[in-house]
């Protein structure tokens, strides 16, 4: 068995601005990541299998189970990432070399419902970005949060469906 670990602390934002990666706060280098995570792999695998078996053991139609599992894979892809502050951010999708459509677009991410149920604390970081960083003083919420977070309310216009969806998620 062999493992490949990495450490790329200098993640770029939606532009050329460097915003960093959350994991670089947790592990100073790839070696430390390996030392810490490799011993946890059996437990993580067991938790994953327990979750999958619980879902597959339900009475939901097969097509629903398949759709749920396929869509959950997005959460472990390059579509999402965490800033050093711990805030979860997301692209609308990914291409070969970079993400597609930046800014955790509110009227796209409103349709993603797995994170609040499976990773509630991560979902709260997305709400924090939407309401405390991407909302302008006049109450309009940018539908794409700029990075760094200090710039999140600059630029893009609001989208009614995005802002209303964010309000519903808080409710």
Question: What role is predicted for each listed range?
Answer:
Residues 9-17, 125-129:
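Short, solvent-exposed loop/turn and secondary-structure capping segments
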Residues 1-8:
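Short Pro-Gly-centered flexible turn/kink motifs
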Residues 2, 13-16, 114:
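A broad, low-amplitude sensor of folded, mature protein cores
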Residues 25-171:
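Substrate-binding groove/exosite segments of carbohydrate-active enzymes
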Residues 13-28:
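Short, compositionally biased
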């Amino acid at each position: 068995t062999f493992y490949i670990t990495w450490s790329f602390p200098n993640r770029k934002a939606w532009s050329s601005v460097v915003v960093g990666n959350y994991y670089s706060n947790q592990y100073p280098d790839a070696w430390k990541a390996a030392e810490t995570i490799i011993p946890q792999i059996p437990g993580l695998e067991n938790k994953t299998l327990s979750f999958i078996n619980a879902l597959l053991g339900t009475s939901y139609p097969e097509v629903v189970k398949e759709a749920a599992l396929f869509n959950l894979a997005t959460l472990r892809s390059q579509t999402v990432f965490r800033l050093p502050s711990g805030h979860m951010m997301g692209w609308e999708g990914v291409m070969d070399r970079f993400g597609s459509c930046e800014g955790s677009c509110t009227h796209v991410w409103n349709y993603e419902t797995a994170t609040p149920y499976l990773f509630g604390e991560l979902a709260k970081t997305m709400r924090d970005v939407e309401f405390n960083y991407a909302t302008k003083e006049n109450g309009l919420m940018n539908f794409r949060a700029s990075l760094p977070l200090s710039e999140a309310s600059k630029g893009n216009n609001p989208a009614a469906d995005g802002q209303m969806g964010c309000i519903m998620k808080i409710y």
